[in-house]
Amino acid sequence: MIQGIQITKSDNENLLNSIWLIDNEKNEARCLVAPAQYKEDQVVPASELGEYESREVAIEAPKAQEGGQHLNVNVLKRETLEDAIKHPENYPQLTIRVSGYAVRFNSLTPEQQQDVLTRTFTESL
């Protein structure tokens, strides 16, 4: 279980008012905010914090979201892709979006190029 704390008293003055996530199962501490010595998001053994007094800080995990829509936008003409299929040497830098990734059109197989052409351009909505 992970617990959020703010250190209110410590022999190490660099820890005063710092905020940490303490993972008791792994015996680790992740720094969220510290005035000195520790960097944000730094993970250290919990024993490195030494003796301290603290107050609990509420932790809220974001709700998981499922579903949604994905849209790839390629701004070009159908004729450009058709010409790139016929004359790839004229379009060495032509980059398109496929499933959220940028890819060089010429690196796709002929079947993939035709699939992109079919999916990208429609007659109507």
UniProtKB/Swiss-Prot annotation:
Matches recorded under Pfam families: Gly_radical
Modified sites of kind Glycine radical: G100
Endoplasmic reticulum is among the record's keywords: no
Superkingdom per UniProt: Bacteria
MF (Gene Ontology): formate C-acetyltransferase activity
Disulphide connectivity of cysteines: none
Keyword annotations of the record: Organic radical
Entry coiled-coil feature ranges: none
Gene Ontology CC annotations of this record: cytosol
Statement: the UniProt record of this protein carries the keyword Mitochondrion: no
All residue ranges annotated as the Glycine radical domain in the record: 5-125
Role of this protein: Acts as a radical domain for damaged PFL and possibly other radical proteins.
Protein name per the record: Autonomous glycyl radical cofactor
Organism expressing this protein natively: Psychromonas ingrahamii (strain DSM 17664 / CCUG 51855 / 37)
Gene name linked to the record: grcA
